[in-house]
Amino acid sequence: MAMGEALRAAAADAVVTFLWVLCVSTLGASTTAVTSYLRLQGVHFALLVTVSLLSVLLFVFNILCDALGGASFNPTGVAAFYAAGVTSPSLFSIALRLPAQAAGAVGGALAISELMPAQYRHMLGGPSLKVDPHTGAGAELVLTFVITLAVLLIIVKGPRNPIIKTWMISICTLCLVLSGAAYTGPSMNPANAFGWAYVNNRHNTWEQFYVYWICPFIGAILAAWIFRAMFLTPPPKPKAKKA
């Protein structure tokens, strides 16, 4: 990949990640607003609204990412699709895209912190560690492993209908968010975690790097390798020509 293409990919990732963090951070407030307006009570209604909003958000961002040439808002997604052999960006391009995503996330977190109405501002804050670092790191590794494997299966081997794909990813994401809420927030997206850590002045700690960067990458790459070994058929070997 040429320098210009790599820079364009990094810029696209920065923009998409900025918009993603800006939008996804409003899910809690949006769910509250919708359920209050429709006078819906009960956790099951709140979960249904959240899944629906997340599905719409993912569907829109899938279109946006495709329009920008395959942009991404999750560093582990870039690494996983590369490790699985689904995409083949250059390592130089990846080296530019990951910090661009982190910078975009910082911008998105700062922007929504200013734009969010005062009555919903307490719902912001991003993922935070609620257990000891090793337990939190293990939780992020497992959660990122599961969501990465699920996303690869749904996108590469799942149904062709993009709406069904988006709905399946939304349900998987919400289930894992609820499962990891008591451990790390959770994040499953190092850029998103970094953006909020920067806002809360926790971005330059070993704990942040260990829990929200190292272990999610390990989980994502392990999932990609397993997916590649189990679900991607290797190309047939050319037959040797007879002398």
Swiss-Prot record:
UniProt KW Iron-sulfur keyword: no
Motif stretch (NPA 1): 74-76
SUPFAM superfamilies: Aquaporin-like
GO MF terms, alphabetically ordered: water channel activity
Keywords assigned by UniProt, alphabetized: Membrane, Repeat, Transmembrane, Transmembrane helix, Transport
Listed Pfam families: MIP (PF00230)
Database matches in InterPro entries: Aquaporin-like (IPR023271), MIP (IPR000425), SIP1-1/2-like (IPR044222)
Subcellular location field: Membrane
Bilayer topology term: Multi-pass membrane protein
Transmembrane segments: 9-29, 45-65, 98-118, 136-156, 163-183, 211-231
Highest taxon above the source species: Eukaryota
CC annotations in GO: membrane
Motif NPA 2: chain residues: 189-191
Function description: Aquaporins facilitate the transport of water and small neutral solutes across cell membranes.
Similarity-based family: Belongs to the MIP/aquaporin (TC 1.A.8) family. SIP (TC 1.A.8.10) subfamily.
Record's comment describing the protein's domains: Aquaporins contain two tandem repeats each containing three membrane-spanning domains and a pore-forming loop with the signature motif Asn-Pro-Ala (NPA).
Entry protein name: Aquaporin SIP1-2
Organism of this sequence: Zea mays (Maize)
